[in-house]
Amino acid sequence: MKTIEITVPGSKSLTNRAIILASLSNGTSKISNISNSQDSQIMIKAMKKIGVQIKKTGNKLLIKGNGGVFRKIDGNIDVGDAGTVARFLTAIISLIPGKITLIKSKRMKERPMKELIKALKTIRTGIILIRGDISSQFISSIMMIAPILDKGLVINITGRRISNSYIDMTIDLMKKFGVKVEKNKQNKFIIKKQSIIPTNYVVESDLSGASYFFAAGAISGKTIKVKNINFRSKQGDLIFPDLLKKMGCHIKKNIKKGWIKVKGPKILKRINVNMSEMPDTAQTLAIVAAFAKGKTTIAGLSTLKMKETDRLKALKNELNKMKIKCEITDDSIKIEGGTPQKATIETYGDHRMAMAFTVAKLRIPGLKIKNPEVVKKSFPSFWKKFNYICE
């Protein structure tokens, strides 16, 4: 059987971070292989509105940074339901003279922001205290503005830290923009006042997006190769194929050429796993688990309740429709694998619900996905890519 080769677009998470850092730098940066996701388009529009010069050509951006010096601005900025934009922009506008109001979707208004706002109120003192168990985006947003603060910043994180991989991703990208981040103990970061150096940066492939094609290989009998993988990536989702290997999949990696190949076994095995470092691929693994033999437990999912929808409840509802038994707690889901049946899947306005359940169509041709257009939030070309592997 032939190998189906796929590439995925640039990471939305890294694109949005690169836009912020380039905007705060002291010169012109070129960002290539950007995500053309809806969220990244919202980020570009928002940064332009606060005075940053950005020129977009295809999947490239030319950004003229202002060194963190903004003119007075009054007005509204629509961030829709883009979580990274809302959190990252809140940190930046706390430094801008004037009154700026972020217009958010109904769901975005329900997602946590208070802890970030509380921390930003003391940011000019040079020392802040922030909880680490709500959203890693709070910490990333504060880290990225720290170099332009007069006193720099000491960030003290209380409680356990969730989604550490996203914080590591932020630190790694800051280094690429010439920023030094000191780590003092597990929950303390020191970022001195310093210049953010403009750079030419190529955005890595989106490994959350790649997970759907890895999962497709796991359940379909097809051999699928995802190309342009950066094996030095800080994206937590890099280890997703390793989880599939534990479930019995055949995995091949070529670090030099940058690809990962996945082919599923005749019978998938259950798995017990903590996915706190890669929560965006939990729904993908849940679909694979639905076809596995035995009960799979996926833990470390406390943040899923606060995403585009309550993803744990949404998973339970839709898996039940497919005649798959599952149980949920505040931070986990247990799935009894079996023979999923065709159903009409509600996506709850959540791009990851749509893409994860679409994978099941490879085994259940009659499965229907409601509001399939929601994928544009992170992966506008998803359907084109998926239809290619169905040929």
Residue ranges of each PLM-predicted region?
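Structural preference for solvent-exposed beta-strand-turn elements
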Residues: 1-391
